[in-house]
Amino acid sequence: MVALQIPSLAATVRQDFPILNQEINGHPLVYLDNAATSQKPRAVLEKLMHYYENDNANVHRGAHQLSVRATDAYEAVRNKVAKFINARSPREIVYTRNATEAINLVAYSWGMNNLKAGDEIITTVMEHHSNLVPWQMVAAKTGAVLKFVQLDEQESFDLEHFKTLLSEKTKLVTVVHISNTLGCVNPAEEIAQLAHQAGAKVLVDACQSAPHYPLDVQLIDCDWLVASGHKMCAPTGIGFLYGKEEILEAMPPFFGGGEMIAEVFFDHFTTGELPHKFEAGTPAIAEAIALGAAVDYLTDLGMENIHNYEVELTHYLWQGLGQIPQLRLYGPNPKHGDRAALASFNVAGLHASDVATMVDQDGIAIRSGHHCTQPLHRLFDASGSARASLYFYNTKEEIDLFLQSLQATIRFFSDDDFTV
């Protein structure tokens, strides 16, 4: 594939996203809420329709041609996902509804059966609730103890503090790869290496990295990795869990029912092979097949191309926001190193929801709230924040429109100039 020129990336792909070709309140839609969910290219939408119009049947359960075609398409995606993250085998890819379900699968199947009173789980203060609440539930049941890595002076993962938390009691390190609030890129490879030296297992939440960065689970050497399809151009209702094959083999099923069995008797059952023993019931067939189309789309663009273009956008966004004195920005400045294509902020004297409502009047979609990171916001003494998050179909011109709307919002709520 010929590498796309970075400045032309958005211009090349925007025509693939029908939803972007609309107006909101008389203004062109500027979609800057990609950390919540991405938009879907036409190729993904067409794959959904093709399945329902041509191949709609249950998988693994029929000899007729519709079922055969559906099964072949469904299982082919497992190979694509494995290749996308450089897993050793498609047997290491488990379909889930989303990353939340994937984390809960590990928490209940592995955590409940391997953790005991006094064992320690290390996570961070920046975690999404989906990578915190399940482990709180496990800790409450098993007596395990949660330990939290704090932020450094750049409001990033404090590696030195992490090192002080590791001990022979550490059994699990579960961390977000990229914070959906701070935008910091955590050193997953180094975290995994240090955790393994202490004898702990490692789970990586890749929801914010899988859509934006090349991923290599063998290089990271994590034991599990989770991601949601809807953040990487796929439909809602589909995600995946990667797990090292030998670890998944040792884990009992999370759900029971059809598909996950080998044989069933009146008094017992035997489980099926990997990865099907974790996939009870009729799966999200159409969504999984469409996930494959999304993976194809991202692969064709090139994850390095996507990342490089977004780096340019991130610097442009951060530079513009940094010139507004009323803002309190969260997370590391990109001039200090790699960070994700998002910016969370608060405006002095304004509620984040008011900011989001005002820029929406100009057709600009951003997120307001706590972004499922309430504990992190409490550290900042903030009830929430506004967040603008980018993807490869966004442009500098859209960032300019957002900055203009934000500045107009600040002027609207202020009788005269003010500073923090």
From Swiss-Prot:
Pfam families listed in its UniProt record: Aminotran_5
Keywords assigned by UniProt, alphabetized: Pyridoxal phosphate, Transferase
Modified residue annotations for N6-(pyridoxal phosphate)lysine: 231
Assigned EC number: 2.8.1.7
Superkingdom: Bacteria
Catalytic activity as recorded in UniProt: (sulfur carrier)-H + L-cysteine = (sulfur carrier)-SH + L-alanine
Cross-referenced Gene3D superfamilies: Aspartate Aminotransferase, domain 1, Type I PLP-dependent aspartate aminotransferase-like (Major domain)
Cofactor annotation: pyridoxal 5'-phosphate
Alphabetical GO biological process terms: cysteine metabolic process
GO MF terms, alphabetically ordered: cysteine desulfurase activity; pyridoxal phosphate binding
Top class in the EC scheme: transferase
Active site: 372
Family per similarity comment: Belongs to the class-V pyridoxal-phosphate-dependent aminotransferase family. Csd subfamily.
Chain's role: Catalyzes the removal of elemental sulfur and selenium atoms from L-cysteine, L-cystine, L-selenocysteine, and L-selenocystine to produce L-alanine.
Protein name in the entry: Probable cysteine desulfurase
The organism of origin for this protein: Synechocystis sp. (strain ATCC 27184 / PCC 6803 / Kazusa)
